[in-house]
Each structure stands twice: as C-alpha cells, then as structure tokens.
Amino acid sequence: MKQVVYIANSESKNIEVWNLCKSGKMNLIQKIETDGKIQPINIIQKRNLLYAGIFPDNKIITYSINHNGFLEKKNESNIPGKANYISFDKKKEFLFCSSYHSNFISVSPLNKFGIPQNPIQIIYNIEGCHAAKMNYKYNILFVISLKEDCIYLYYLTDFGILKSTEQNILHTQKKSGPRHIIFHPNQDFVYTINELNGTIDVWKIYKKNNVIKVKNIQNIHVLKNRFLKDYWCSDIHITSCGRFLYACDRFFNIISLFHINQNDNKLVFFKSYDTEEQPRSFNINSHNTHLIVAGEKSNTFIIYSISNSTGELKKINVYSTGQRPVWILIHALC
C-alpha cells in the first residue's frame, strides 16, 4: 500500500506532499500554495479529501487526493474564526472546527461531495478551544478548553446539533492547559496532553445506571523525574495496536514513549528521545512502522522506525521542509 505524507507549512503558506517508501526513504512530489497561512489539516480517507484551515481570511480549503497522493483544490468554505483543529463525526457527515483564538466550536454539515457548508451550530465562550474529537463508540464530542483547564462533553444528535451530556464537563489540574486528545483503539479510554504542566491525563469511559460517565484514572509526566516549572507540550498519538503512546514537548525538544498497560490501559513511562527543534506535530503511519516529527522552529522533519516489540524509535533520516511546519499527516492510498 502506497503512503504519502502531508506537511502544512504555515509561514511558507503551502502544503508539501512526500512519498514514503517502506524503507523509510522519502521524496518530495508536490508543493501546493494555500493562499494564506495554514494550520490544521485532516483527511477523510474513504472520500480521498483533505481539509486545511487557513487564516487570516478564515476558511477551510477542501482538496481532492488523487491515486498518487497529489492534491487538487476543490472548494473554499468560510468559517467564523481561525481554525486550530479539524475533526469529523463517525459517518463523516459533519465537520467540527475548534478555534483557540475565537473561543468556539462549530459544526458544519458536509454535502454529498464532502464540501463543508455554513455552520449550523457555533458554541462560544469555550476559552482557548484548542481541539475537539469525537468518540465514535459513545457518540460524545470531547471539546478541549485550554484556558479553562477543562474538557466539555457533548452528544451529537442525528441532525448535527451538539447537546451537553449528563456529566457535561471534565476538570483537569489547575494551570495544566489541556491541548490535544487521542482515544485508545477500544474507545473506552482517553488520553489528553496538558501543554502547561507537562502531563498526560488518562480517562476511563463507562456506563453507570445507563448513563455514560468519564473519570480520571491517571496523571503522569511526559518526562520521568523532571518536575519543572516550564513545559510546552504539544501533540499526542497512539499506535493502532493500542500498545504504545507517544507525546512531545517543545520546550525540551523531546518525544516520549509510554507503554500502555494491557490490563488497565494506564501509561508506563519508557523512554524520551531528543528530536527536532520545537516539535509541534507528529504522526504515526497505519502499519505502526514509522513515526514522523516536524520541527516548527528547525524547519525540518525526522522519520523514525518503530520497534514492533518495544515501540522504541530509531532515527532513519532528517529532511528539510518549508517554514514553520505546524501539522503533519501520513496517509495510506487506497
């Protein structure tokens, strides 16, 4: 299966497309201008569509992905603020856009061609709304509020309207700054990375008296035995096998590996690796064989191989990219 890598370069105002070989060797095949600074990108695999959040003319550009991974611009859709995170519901009928700077989460229907329409709902006053991600098993949208140190919980109705769950809100530690979120493959556990205090929270989802509940079961530092004042954590991802979790910090320029306890799904710190300068974004391929980290300040990205037995990373190569790479995705072509 052919793999391509998409890198969003904010200051260069472009998306780079790279081939990724099984050996880990990479080569640039396309560079497409975005007519503005770019931040989040995301893909709907079954439709071969890539969505990019553009500012200061706040909009989402939809690109088609051809059989070789090349991008072609299809449409522009206006949004009411700067996009920081793009995600979708399970059926890929709705697009969720988080805005850290405008403090909202919006819901936009996708038409039959996958094009975002005008938002049908905007929930304001979510301070520092940095990310929102749907738990497909429980039909709950987890909406991150970095500045409020909390996570809002919403059910999604069949009509695309968000309504608060019975629990409504999860509180993280004060001044922790929750930023990004990932679900365990079984969808029963949630991992959130806290930008400001350098920790990861582990949450368990369960049902009690037919009501869905979420509780915190662990808080663990991204760096072992280094409890310092300054952290600047950014991204978090888990392998599809559910055994390994990775998290990065931009202050220390590291990426840490955790093993996931197969009994309770809590995290066990394993190792940290020095990586590219200011690692804002990274991604893991679908086969769990490679991990790529983009250095926002170094304007480079590094590709590692992943050990199947331990999750350990081994550097393969470093490549130069555009100015200020802020988002990276690895896509398997059908």
From Swiss-Prot:
Pfam families xrefs: Lactonase (PF10282)
Give the pathway. Carbohydrate degradation; pentose phosphate pathway; D-ribulose 5-phosphate from D-glucose 6-phosphate (oxidative stage): step 2/3
Query: Which SUPFAM superfamilies does this one have?
Result: Putative isomerase YbhE
The reactions it catalyses are: 6-phospho-D-glucono-1,5-lactone + H2O = 6-phospho-D-gluconate + H(+)
- UniProt cross-references to Gene3D superfamilies, sorted A to Z: YVTN repeat-like/Quinoprotein amine dehydrogenase
What task does this protein carry out? Catalyzes the hydrolysis of 6-phosphogluconolactone to 6-phosphogluconate.
HAMAP family in the cross-refs = 6P_gluconolactonase
Its recorded name reads 6-phosphogluconolactonase
User: What organism does the record attribute this protein to?
Assistant: Buchnera aphidicola subsp. Acyrthosiphon pisum (strain 5A)
